[in-house]
Design a protein with these regions (language model features):
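Short amphipathic alpha-helices and their capping/turn segments at secondary-structure boundaries
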Residues: 204-212, 291-296, 328-332
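Short, surface-exposed amphipathic charged segments that create phosphate/polyanion-binding patches used
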Residues: 232-236, 290-292, 389-397
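Acidic, His- and aromatic-enriched active-site or binding-groove loops in soluble protein domains
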Residues: 214-224, 271-287
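Conserved residues at the C-terminal ends of beta-strands
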Residues: 257, 277-279, 307, 345
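Conserved beta-strand positions in the central sheet of alpha/beta enzyme cores
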Residues: 218, 255, 274-275, 341-343
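Terminal accessory/targeting
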Residues: 1-194, 200-201, 264, 268-269, ...
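Catalytic cores of extracellular degradative/oxidative enzymes
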Residues: 153-154, 168-263
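Mobile, glycine-enriched helix-loop/loop "lid" segments at the mouths of ligand-binding/catalytic clefts
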Residues: 281-300
């Protein structure tokens, strides 16, 4: 833990919001200074980086990062800010949802989500508070250390600038019927993807067909009624059923319906990875967000956060039939070398206008893959890489370093250094383009 000047980690501040180094929004108890209980648009108390502070942060880095990733800042926020609509309204909505057309649903959702663009935190359209804070900690270490650069294992295999993950949540019969055509479309652009299937949909044959074509199948909630995380007892009962179905189908990943979540309950799910946490959830019924564009562990489960707007929200809530917002989010995530992840529903892109938007996105990703060295992979491959990377170690090698451990043949040594007041990265031995081979 970073310590204060007395040599012991202490705090007198109340738990709340503050900024560090003028940019990173934090939630926790700093070792000095004040906090704000709520975010109301006023400037937050700032803990300036002191030039002669040495390798000491004025905050508990682990606590603040966990609070943001696990969305614990929601504990003191007004409930209306993070759950849009009462439970009775949500129950009624999900009871009649199957018979509502998209036109009626999007009208109701626009009413329910009114004011979403005025929510101050997490920052829209991409929040990288955790990543900014980690970079500030690196800056402090570089300032305090004698070496001009610090080695680390690069985030992605083969020196790729960022990771890309395409996923398809299948909500109903209409979506199930379009899965085959959607796989063909993804294949035509060389984009691997995963399909999340509702276990109670009776679509075992569709799951087998998807897997036979080389695509991933994951589970999507239990029955998509929006109640999975309503209370702990119900969740644990359904978790047993979900786990049993995952074993039968050989599924390694999970995503809840409508991105409802309670990360502290994830240990009851027997999956290698989860995809239920958005980066910023202004357009979801459950507000919040993990404030990072990087995968992270929740216990033994790797969280692969959703870092871009869902197709339904883009097309039917905002009403934007271009990929301009997606392109903006991609650039913001690329600047952080993060995971660019998408949800595109086969239920909503099977008509001409919506399908054309998705084709534009696929074409854009295909161009960027070559121009910007993106690693485009299904979630299972990303989970395997990230777990391997966590177990890798830097090994001294003459005057430099090499990476040791399983999968290290695809790993790259990178160096962080300061360019003025900015942390910059240099990748050693990066290839011209990411490789598709495994080791």
């Amino acid at each position: 833990m970073f310590q204060d000047d007395s040599g012991a980690a202490t705090t007198t501040a109340d738990e709340g919001f503050f900024t560090y180094d003028g940019d990173a929004v934090c939630y926790g108890r700093p070792f000095r200074g004040n906090t704000a209980k709520y975010l109301n648009g006023d400037p937050l108390p700032d803990l300036a980086m002191e030039p002669h502070s040495g390798p000491r942060l004025p905050l508990d880095l682990s606590e603040v990062v966990t609070n943001l990733r696990r969305e614990r800042y929601r504990r003191i926020r007004p409930r209306a800010e993070f759950v849009a609509g009462s439970s009775s309204v949500r129950n009624l909505y999900y009871a009649v949802r199957p018979v509502l057309g998209v036109a009626i649903r999007k009208h109701l959702q626009r009413l329910r989500l009114a004011g979403w663009n005025a929510i101050p935190f997490p920052r829209w359209p991409v929040d990288a508070s955790v990543d900014t804070l980690m970079r500030s900690a690196m800056k402090l270490a570089l300032r305090a250390g004698e070496a001009p650069r610090i080695p680390f294992i690069w985030f992605w295999p083969d020196g790729a600038d960022a990771g890309v993950m395409m996923t398809h949540d299948v909500e109903g019969e209409r979506g199930l019927k379009y899965c085959d055509a959607l796989m063909t479309l993804d294949e035509s652009f060389g984009i691997p993807s995963s399909f999340q299937i509702v276990p109670t949909s009776g679509a075992a044959d569709v799951c087998v067909a998807i897997q036979r074509r080389g695509f991933e199948v994951n589970l999507h909630d239990w029955n998509h009624d929006g109640r999975l995380f309503r209370d702990k007892r119900l969740f644990l009962k359904r978790a047993e059923l979900i786990n049993a179905q995952a074993r039968r189908l050989g599924c390694r990943g999970f995503r809840s319906a409508v991105m409802y979540r309670e990360q502290d309950w994830f240990d009851a799910l027997e999956f290698d990875y989860d995809m239920s946490v958005p980066n910023v959830a202004h357009l979801d019924p459950q507000r919040g967000g993990c404030c990072t564009v990087m995968p992270y562990f929740v216990g033994d489960i790797l969280e692969l956060p959703l870092t871009t707007i869902q197709d339904y929200s883009l097309l039917h809530v905002i009403g934007d039939y271009s990929i301009a917002l997606w392109r903006r989010q991609i650039e913001l995530i690329l600047a952080e070398h993060g995971l660019i992840s998408f949800i595109v529903h086969p239920d909503y892109v099977n008509t001409k206008r919506e399908n054309e938007v998705y084709v534009q996105l696929l074409a854009h990703l295909n161009r960027l893959r070559a121009q910007r060295k993106l690693w485009v992979a299904p979630p299972g491959d990303i989970e395997r890489w990230w777990r391997q990377r966590q177990a890798m170690r830097l090994v001294p090698d003459g005057a430099g370093w090499r990476v040791g451990g399983d999968g290290s043949c695809r790993a790259r040594v990178a160096y962080a250094s300061l360019d003025g007041d900015r942390v910059v990265y240099e990748i050693e031995g990066a290839r011209e383009a990411p490789l598709a081979s495994r080791c």
